[in-house]
Every structure is written in C-alpha cells, then in structure tokens.
C-alpha cells in the first residue's frame, strides 16, 4: 500500500535534487500504473485515465486541479472526449522530484472515486 498518497509536497527550488537512480525504482513501484516518459531530455510521469464521456473527463480534470492547487504543484493535463492524460514533472528542476510521485499517487486516489471511469 502506498503512503505517497498521504504525503504532502515540499517546496521545490531550482537547486533541489532530482530523484536519484536508487530512489526511482522504489518510488515507481508505489505507482505501478504510471509510465516514465522522456520529453526533451526531461523525465516525466504519465498516465491516461478513461471515462464514459467528456463531462466525466472534465470533472476529473477539475478534481486533479483542486488537489494541485492545494499542494502548489501542477501537472500537464490533456482533457479529451472520454480521456484525461495527466503528466507530472518538476519544471524548476527539469525532471522528477518526490513531489511528482506524491501527486501521481494522490491523482490515483482522486480517480478511485471519479464518476464515469471506464
């Protein structure tokens, strides 16, 4: 069981360390349905959530927005008909920080109660 979903983000400065090669496999095991993507040499966490229609996808997007605002850490969100792609990375350090794993786990928690999930 992941404890990341109960953790809170810490302020991430430009000089904060990225997740180490040793930490990465430990953290990713706690969010097994997320993929690591590399774009422009920047590692990111990404997951696609499927919904029955656009209304449910948009409601989920807004719910993720609420937890993001509360933690002061914001994802890339692509909302389409029946689908939301959520991408987490730390802009200030151009890579992955523990905050990204926390927010991925918290996104999964929001998804558990999201209406209209497929």
Curated annotation (Swiss-Prot):
One of its GO terms (biological process) is tetrahydrobiopterin biosynthetic process. Pfam families: Pterin_4a. InterPro entries: PCD_sf, Pterin-4-alpha-carb_dehyd, Pterin_deHydtase. It catalyses: (4aS,6R)-4a-hydroxy-L-erythro-5,6,7,8-tetrahydrobiopterin = (6R)-L-erythro-6,7-dihydrobiopterin + H2O. It is an enzyme of class 4 (lyase). It comes from the Bacteria. SUPFAM superfamilies: PCD-like. CDD domains: PCD_DCoH_subfamily_a (cd00913). Keywords: Lyase. Its EC number is 4.2.1.96. Transmembrane segments: none annotated. GO terms for molecular function: 4-alpha-hydroxytetrahydrobiopterin dehydratase activity. Belongs to the pterin-4-alpha-carbinolamine dehydratase family. This is Putative pterin-4-alpha-carbinolamine dehydratase. It comes from Pseudomonas fluorescens (strain Pf0-1). The lineage of its organism: Bacteria, Pseudomonadati, Pseudomonadota, Gammaproteobacteria, Pseudomonadales.
